[in-house]
Design a protein with these regions (language model features):
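Ser/Thr-centric signal marking residues that sit
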Residues: 29, 59-64, 91
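N-terminal leader segment of winged-helix/HTH proteins
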Residues: 1-26, 71, 119-122
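Residues within helix-turn-helix
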Residues: 47-48, 59, 66, 86
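N-terminal helix-turn-helix DNA-binding core of bacterial DNA-binding proteins
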Residues: 17-57
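Alpha-helical transmembrane segments and membrane-interface helix-loop junctions
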Residues: 47, 139-142
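Short, locally clustered residues in the helix-turn-helix/winged-helix DNA-binding domain
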Residues: 9, 37-41, 102
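Charged, amphipathic alpha-helical coiled-coil/dimerization segments
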Residues: 67-129, 136
Length: 142
């Protein structure tokens, strides 16, 4: 059967295709684009917060951040309040791509919302939360 899983997989693939245009424009991958969009919305944030928001494995997130630092799109500094933590922030060079990516995602989300009913949106949110709970608890048990 796998109807729900197939739909989720297809949605993830379609988002990747949608964000692929930013690879051409700014040289960023889909996961890098999501990091830039989150930073544009939140401003300076901790790596822990990014990990919680995006769900990447710590090593994967570190690689994504390394590439964005190398391109000059973000900075990664030791937290002033907790020397064991690091904060990430957009640079001036990263602000434009982050704003463009965030605007594109916002526009896409608005189009989806306009074509959906509120129960659809709540259902998708519940499915995503349930998936996160199940995957995170399974990974912890391993």
């Amino acid at each position: 059967m796998l109807n729900l899983i197939s739909s989720l997989q297809k949605s993830a693939q379609l988002l990747t295709l949608y964000l692929d245009k930013f690879r051409k424009d700014y040289g960023v991958t889909q996961p890098e684009a999501h990091v830039l969009a989150v930073l544009h919305v939140r401003g300076e944030t901790s790596i822990r917060n990014l990990h919680h928001t995006l769900g990447h494995k710590p090593s994967t997130l570190t690689s994504i951040l390394d590439r964005l630092v190398a391109r000059g799109f973000i900075t990664r500094e030791t937290s002033q309040t907790d020397r064991r933590s690091f904060n990430v922030e957009l640079t001036l060079a990263g602000t434009v791509p982050a704003a463009v990516i965030r605007a594109a995602l916002h526009s896409l989300e608005n189009k989806i919302v306009r074509r959906s009913v509120s129960t659809d949106i709540r259902g998708i949110t519940r499915v995503a939360s349930t998936l996160e709970e199940l995957i995170v608890s399974t990974r912890r048990a391993e």
